[in-house]
Amino acid sequence: MPSNVSSAERPTFPKRAVITGGMPYGNKNLHFGHIGGVFVPADFFARFLRDRIGSQNVVFVSGTDCYGSPIMEGYRKKVEGEGYDGSIVDYVSANHEAQLQALEAYGISLDLFAGSGLEPA
C-alpha cells in the first residue's frame, strides 16, 4: 500500500533541547498536581527527545522557587504555630530537599533541580 507521506512531511527534531518544569514554591513538599501535572509530562518529553536526539543533547531542569508571599506566609505560620526556630533559608532548604526526594521517588529524570535563592548547584 503506497504512502502519501513524503519525507518532507516527517517530523524534524531540534539538535539540542532544554526542557523545563515549572518551579514550585519552597513553602511545602510537592503534591499530586506538581508531580502529575508538571513533572510527569515534562519528564515524558525529555525522555522522548533523549531517545530521538541523544541524551547528551537534552537538559531537563527545574527547581524550587525561593521567593514570594507563599513562602513568607508558610514560614510565619511555622514560626508562630509550631515554634520553628530556624531561619527562612533553613525552612526553604528543608522544603527543597523534600521536593527533590519526592521527584527522585517518582523517578523523574531531572538533570538539575536547583533553588532560585539557594547556593549554586
Spell out what each predicted region is.
Residues 2-121:
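N-terminal, positively charged nucleic-acid-binding surface of large information/translation enzymes
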